[in-house]
């Protein structure tokens, strides 16, 4: 098959469905590519797991999928996983592997008040690399950090068809409600763009929401344009998870809205 007839196959990996925020930007920019999405719901949430477990589960899932669908690129659409899995993944795969990094640099450039909020998982806000990003790009800013698992759960419920509990959301963000000059918010978890409108309702003083999805989509395009492709011309976009879940039948009915044809359970334990 001529390489011009092939579409790049790109895998998005996350512990949940937060990576949809990254996937949708890629699909918007590159609508005809072949996309795979795997969420490790059996290991969710990664913010509560040890680094060794995150590395093991990510490697196992990605290797299993790559055996069936030779990948041209991989996106770790999870901030928590990106802090630990990129070196072992790059050692195991000879393809571009793109991580997700909180958009602290662009936030520091756009803020007018020099007061930034970093909203991420509990694991991410404590990582040393966050200290390094702030020291490198935002030394002249006050950077508030809020680590939350609750917002991840709220976003998961929204994507599965449930309404957002604004009372719980407002309560989780209450420590920032009185910060009138907090004008920029870094959405440091891929789940959070999925509930950006609801977050805005709770924090009306925030003018700028920064997250890396669009930049990641452009990076994928740059890395794979005009490259020799491994993947065959697969027709359908596929989704994988690692355990059955209560709303699975309802979730499957909504897959086509995101451009996927099927959901398959894979075992990685």
From Swiss-Prot:
Record's PANTHER family? Answer: GLUTAMATE RACEMASE (PTHR21198:SF2)
Pathway assigned to this chain's UniProt record: Cell wall biogenesis; peptidoglycan biosynthesis
| Record-annotated membrane-spanning stretches | none
Keywords for this entry? Cell shape, Cell wall biogenesis/degradation, Isomerase, Peptidoglycan synthesis
Recorded GO terms, molecular function? glutamate racemase activity
Documented EC number(s): 5.1.1.3
Provide the reaction this enzyme catalyses.
L-glutamate = D-glutamate
Q: Which domain of life is it from?
A: Bacteria
Q: Where is substrate bound in this sequence?
A: 14-15, 46-47, 79-80, 190-191
Q: Name one Pfam family in it.
A: Asp_Glu_race
Q: Which GO terms describe its biological process?
A: cell wall organization; peptidoglycan biosynthetic process; regulation of cell shape
Q: Which family does it belong to?
A: Belongs to the aspartate/glutamate racemases family.
Using the record, list the residue span of the signal peptide; answer none if the entry has no such feature.
none
Protein name, per record: Glutamate racemase
What are the positions of the active site? 78, 189
Q: Which PROSITE patterns match?
A: ASP_GLU_RACEMASE_1 (PS00923), ASP_GLU_RACEMASE_2 (PS00924)
Summarizing the function annotation, the protein's role is: Provides the (R)-glutamate required for cell wall biosynthesis.
Gene this chain is encoded by:
murI
Disulfide cross-links: none
